[in-house]
Amino acid sequence: MRVAVAGCCHGELDKIYETLALAERRGPGPVDLLLCCGDFQAVRNEADLRCMAVPPKYRHMQTFYRYYSGEKKAPVLTLFIGGNHEASNHLQELPYGGWVAPNIYYLGLAGVVKYRGVRIGGISGIFKSHDYRKGHFECPPYNSSTIRSIYHVRNIEVYKLKQLKQPIDIFLSHDWPRSIYHYGNKKQLLKTKSFFRQEVENNTLGSPAASELLEHLKPTYWFSAHLHVKFAALMQHQAKDKGQTARATKFLALDKCLPHRDFLQILEIEHDPSAPDYLEYDIEWLTILRATDDLINVTGRLWNMPENNGLHARWDYSATEEGMKEVLEKLNHDLKVPCNFSVTAACYDPSKPQTQMQLIHRINPQTTEFCAQLGIIDINVRLQKSKEEHHVCGEYEEQDDVESNDSGEDQSEYNTDTSALSSINPDEIMLDEEEDEDSIVSAHSGMNTPSVEPSDQASEFSASFSDVRILPGSMIVSSDDTVDSTIDREGKPGGTVESGNGEDLTKVPLKRLSDEHEPEQRKKIKRRNQAIYAAVDDDDDDAA
């Protein structure tokens, strides 16, 4: 089947779907599935905008609300994970995944689903070592700390994913697995993004948690975004046992959705022709969710996952045949993901802006139904009970030094904290942190939300997106992608990209939809939303 992969979406749903439509007209057939690697920005209304970790003047409604309201419908089944610029209050309603709009499905904090027999997993957020061992304690209204910590990856999600034993076909993460740059054209990457050099040389660029998952899961494909550059790599894994076939992972990171940027790629993925063409739950993953329900922590206290160190009665939560049988019986042997989307919040109305809309910590009926079927407790229900008991959400958020559960280990598993680039990125505009702090929503006051008007010309294909490349039928990492190569005029590899039939797609001329001419030097395209993703907090790793 034909699968499209998008990098950082940044709310540009219309542009992405329009680009897909153009690619379909030029290509061999329709796209069956769209995968988005974070910064999706499922913003329904003005309150959601205030929960996105960017300065107020760079918050824009974009066009997702039209898909949420039913005014528009996604033309292709769309799956996405969360990044570090999201409507966090919206995604928090769906910790185990769910529909954010008809035909648009969020994978949750971490999740695994199946589509046409293809097993797709993902983890939302970015890595930060000081939040990694905390629970999911954040809830609206967020403060200056929780508006950022809510999208930081937690060890419980990594732990659950590491219980998987069956092969994964595709895995999504927002930030890159650490060290993946050593398996691709590193020289080309550093010529394109020279400010990565220090992190690459120190081997601190990317997420160590994602790297741990890559080593454990060994998926056929791994897609990421976050660093705003296209990069391919081929990682050959070592076989654990003699006689066992060594597996390999094809890694691809994509750019953000801007004109003349490599933000979209189409691949041919092998699938099971006899498998249903609707989204299915994954039985192994559901069994793991059920088994690990008692491990959920909704405080900010540090918490170590069970391990075989003599301190835990149980440390293996992988799915058993008996456990999977029980889950199947609970679901009446029906693994189809129900199309049970419902509107849970007021939708943005351009004619009636509501800049003082109240923030509410909602319980989503999709999550309630899912938890009832599986026999687990909604994280948000636990949070609300905790809030009632302590009169404040996230009471323990500053207690990083609290003794962790049943473990003598006080230090984080990882001694670095650089999921994203810590160098200054000249591709972005640095924003004043003091201004950023002013953006945080107070629990006791409403805040005006500037710039909530939708994007201009939302229904038209922008001329600035006219430089659309013919997309390859499949991703094959050629030898030129994993060795040093010359750089062309836009800092892109001089190597080849092959289609499924071996054709060199770099030789296909670029086709344009307007009379504009390609300049000798790359234009600086100033768009209303391109600067918002440069917001750097005091730890310098939430920039991308």
Swiss-Prot record:
Residues that bind a divalent metal cation 1: 8, 10, 228
Renumbered residue ranges of the record's region Disordered: 395-463, 476-544
InterPro entries on file: Calcineurin-like_PHP_ApaH, DBR1_C, Dbr1_N, Metallo-depent_PP-like
Tissues of expression: Ubiquitously expressed, strongest expression in the spinal cord and brainstem.
Domain of life assignment: Eukaryota
Ranges of biased composition (kind: Acidic residues): 395-412, 429-439
Annotated residues for binding of a divalent metal cation 2: 39, 84, 174, 226
Residue segments, region Lariat recognition loop: 124-154
Major localization class: nucleus
Its job: Cleaves the 2'-5' phosphodiester linkage at the branch point of excised lariat intron RNA and converts them into linear molecules that can be subsequently degraded, thereby facilitating ribonucleotide turnover. Linked to its role in pre-mRNA processing mechanism, may also participate in retrovirus replication via an RNA lariat intermediate in cDNA synthesis and have an antiviral cell-intrinsic defense function in the brainstem.
Family of this protein: Belongs to the lariat debranching enzyme family.
Name of the protein in its database record: Lariat debranching enzyme
Source organism of the structure: Homo sapiens
Phylogenetic lineage: Eukaryota, Metazoa, Chordata, Craniata, Vertebrata
